[in-house]
Amino acid sequence: RRQRQMCIRDSLYTVHDAEEAVKRIVTCEYGTTLQIADGVKVRFVDAGHLLGSASVEMWLTEGDDTRKVVFSGDIGNRDQPIIRDPQYIRDADYVLTESTYGDRLHDMDKDPDYTADLAAIIDETLGNGGNVIIPSFAVGRTQELLYFIREMKEQGLVKSVPGFSVVVDSPLAGEATRIFSGDLHGYLDEEAIAAPVSYTHLRAHETRSNL
């Protein structure tokens, strides 16, 4: 807005507001039912979308009447790498949910081989002396890519340059990858724990000058 000489609007929230909000955060485990107010109970279940993502079950009681409301952002698919499958909620009186793909049906019978497809592209590009640049969301997608790249390295699918280096040049993606590489039993699926996203020839850089 400043470059376009447009009116600069004041932020709705300040850094101080954010710091004060963080002090009020209370953590809880998936599947734990909490009484957060009179007549209000909540329970978080794994949404299988991003690390720590959750759908929320709410039981609202007024007098003798109890209604169940479910709220959720994105819900993940089954059999995805790293993140556990979503826990499905079977009943509710009202549901509020993110619906980017609400008018599509995912074909769960197809089992695309992402590792082989990506390996073929990387193998051809490196064999021709090039580099592969993959734009990716810092949290979730980057770690999935690193997981697939680890698989192709272990299976020897990139024959032109078997020991090729992998560089993550986003500070946020690098920090997220370090979190994914920690002790996350109960949050990652067993395959991801057995084959983490951190491996030889993987580098994360905070600034461009380090590339």
Segments predicted by a language model, with ranges:
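Conserved small/polar residues in nucleotide/adenosyl-binding loops
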Residues: Q3-D10, T200-T207
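Functional cores that coordinate and move charged inorganic groups
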Residues: V56-W59, D65-F148
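Glycine-rich nucleotide/cofactor/substrate-binding loop typically near the N-terminus or early
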Residues: T14
